[in-house]
């Protein structure tokens, strides 16, 4: 499971000024060869209890950035995001002359992250069991060296490098959990990529008028992005739903919706790209 959230402005939110922030939360499955499920959920705040409520009953691993609200998901195993940590080190790399070949501490931190991503790229075609074994063999030593290096350095509090070190140490309990299962990812990029269509769209439509409109937007984005994630032609899939769903007694028999899901064999045959 991958989680992320982004800001959305809702003009007519009860007891809130129009310019205040509301949030669109995103939850999606991992890249483990199972059907892709990408769900958006509108909520009036960034309180981590929204994630707790949405994921009630889920057991397993979840990937997220360093937002503390996800700490409330205490019944699951949290996997940290090495892409976020790498970004922190990149932001801390100072400008220097092209003649200066010496590595800064921030560059060393970035290079550790790059080593891990390079190894991950070489493992992408393995089974989850093979990936699990290879990670322990190839990545565990890099991780041990990285944390020894982290413990050996200091930086000014509040500096860019200082912030990178604080992030690393705060996220340390979660940063190696992806090693526990070969199906887990080294980063939360899957969620960031899935939420990007919403953030791009937001630049055009700017806001939702009402909470009902924001929830409707969440439903539409969920349908469209899940269809895309399963390799369907979105226009054809929407036509398919509008044609067959009205004749389905899904209100009384919700199990009938399974035949309309993007991973249904009939749907994949009719609506494939």
Residue positions per predicted region:
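Catalytic center-proximal scaffold of phosphoryl-transfer enzymes
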Residues: 1-273
């Amino acid at each position: 499971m991958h989680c992320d959230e982004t800001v959305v402005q809702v003009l007519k939110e009860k007891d809130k000024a129009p310019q205040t922030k509301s949030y669109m939360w995103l939850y999606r499955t991992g890249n483990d060869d199972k059907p892709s499920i990408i769900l958006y959920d509108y909520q009036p705040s960034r309180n981590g209890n929204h994630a707790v409520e949405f994921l009630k009953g889920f057991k397993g691993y979840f990937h997220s950035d360093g937002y503390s609200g996800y700490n409330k998901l205490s019944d699951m195993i949290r996997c940290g995001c090495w892409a976020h940590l790498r970004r922190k080190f990149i932001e801390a790399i100072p400008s220097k002359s092209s003649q200066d070949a010496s590595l800064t501490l921030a560059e060393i931190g970035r290079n550790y992250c790059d080593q891990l991503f390079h190894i991950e790229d070489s493992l992408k075609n393995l089974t989850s069991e093979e990936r699990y074994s290879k990670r322990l063999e190839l990545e565990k030593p890099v991780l041990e060296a990285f944390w020894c290096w982290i413990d050996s350095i200091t930086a000014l509090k509040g500096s860019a490098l200082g912030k990178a070190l604080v992030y690393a140490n705060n996220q340390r309990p979660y940063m190696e959990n992806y090693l526990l299962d070969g199906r887990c990812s080294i980063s939360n990029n899957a969620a960031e990529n899935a939420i990007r269509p919403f953030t791009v769209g937001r630049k055009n439509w700017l806001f939702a008028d009402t909470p009902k409109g924001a929830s409707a937007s969440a439903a539409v984005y969920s349908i469209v992005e899940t269809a895309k994630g399963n390799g369907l032609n979105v226009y054809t899939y929407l036509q398919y739903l509008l044609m067959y769903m009205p004749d389905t007694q899904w209100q009384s028999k919700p199990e009938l919706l399974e035949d309309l899901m993007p991973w249904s064999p009939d749907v994949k045959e009719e609506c494939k790209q």
